[in-house]
């Protein structure tokens, strides 16, 4: 089970706990999309307007991190890479000044939002799963990440109470924001109407058993 759904007894709180790469909410999940680089990160005006192909949201995220640093060699390596973990490791190899680290910490959440927005707007299967979390709270149950995740494994009962979380859950927050943005778009009205016909039990079951 790549996703675990926790529903409180009074049904006022529903957490969708995820982490593994095989889960649609993971940045490693294979989901091709096209997007432009972040405008302010790229000096080449011609490339700014060019749509690039990405295989997953991790690739877009790390590619733009390399652009911010100005390391075009690593940026191109990330674009050519097909393994999400290797994309992440290439991003970690970047040599960043204190100023660049500070800027990236300020901009990274916005870059992740753009990556996820393109991923879910351009992939209907992924979007339908995301829409099934409407009214729920997405939670990256990474036991090791206290910024993008909550610092707890999804099997840990402490996940059921936000007061026990050991991380900020940035990725979960971004995904919640992306879902709400796409949910209101007229072009996805039929998707929305289909989800609204499903019971909470049906949605939870699909979320916990969805496979690529």
Curated annotation (Swiss-Prot):
Gene3D superfamilies attached here? YbiA-like
The record ties this protein, via InterPro entries, to: NADAR, YbiA-like_sf
Keywords, sorted A to Z = Immunity, Innate immunity
Q: Where does the source fall among the domains of life?
A: Eukaryota
Expression is induced as follows: Exposure to P.aeruginosa upregulates expression, in proportion to bacterial strain virulence and dependent on zip-2, but independent of several immunity-related pathways including pmk-1 p38MAPK, dbl-1 TGF-beta, kgb-1 JNK and bar-1/beta-catenin pathways. Cadmium weakly induces expression in a pmk-1-dependent manner. Induced by translational inhibitors such as cycloheximide and exogenous or P.aeruginosa-derived ToxA, in a zip-2 dependent manner.
Q: In which tissues is it expressed?
A: Expressed in the intestine.
Please list the GO biological process terms of this entry. Answer: antibacterial innate immune response; defense response to Gram-negative bacterium; innate immune response
**Metal-binding recorded as keyword:** no
| Primary role | Plays a role in innate immunity by conferring resistance to virulent strains of the Gram-negative bacterium P.aeruginosa via the zip-2 pathway. Can act independently of several immunity-related pathways including pmk-1 p38MAPK, dbl-1 TGF-beta, kgb-1 JNK and bar-1/beta-catenin pathways.
The name on file for this protein is Protein irg-1
Q: Which organism is it from?
A: Caenorhabditis elegans
């Amino acid at each position: 089970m790549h996703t675990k759904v926790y529903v409180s007894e009074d049904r006022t709180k529903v957490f969708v706990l995820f982490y593994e790469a095989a889960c649609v909410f993971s940045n490693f999940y294979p989901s091709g999309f096209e997007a432009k680089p972040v405008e302010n990160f790229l000096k080449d005006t011609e490339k700014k307007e060019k749509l690039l192909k990405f295989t997953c949201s991790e690739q877009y995220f790390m590619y733009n991190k390399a652009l911010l640093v100005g390391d075009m060699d690593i940026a191109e390596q990330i674009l050519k890479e097909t393994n999400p973990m290797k994309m992440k490791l290439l991003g970690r190899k970047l040599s960043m000044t204190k100023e660049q680290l500070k800027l990236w910490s300020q901009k990274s959440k916005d870059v992740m939002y753009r990556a996820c927005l393109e991923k879910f707007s351009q992939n209907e299967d992924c979007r339908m799963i995301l829409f099934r979390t409407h009214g729920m709270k997405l939670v990256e149950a990474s036991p090791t990440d206290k910024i993008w995740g909550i610092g707890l494994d999804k099997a840990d009962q402490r996940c059921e109470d936000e007061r026990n979380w050991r991380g900020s859950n940035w990725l979960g927050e971004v995904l919640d924001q992306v879902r709400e943005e796409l949910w209101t778009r007229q072009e996805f009205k039929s998707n929305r109407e289909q989800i609204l016909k499903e019971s909470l039990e049906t949605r939870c079951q699909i979320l916990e058993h969805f496979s690529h």
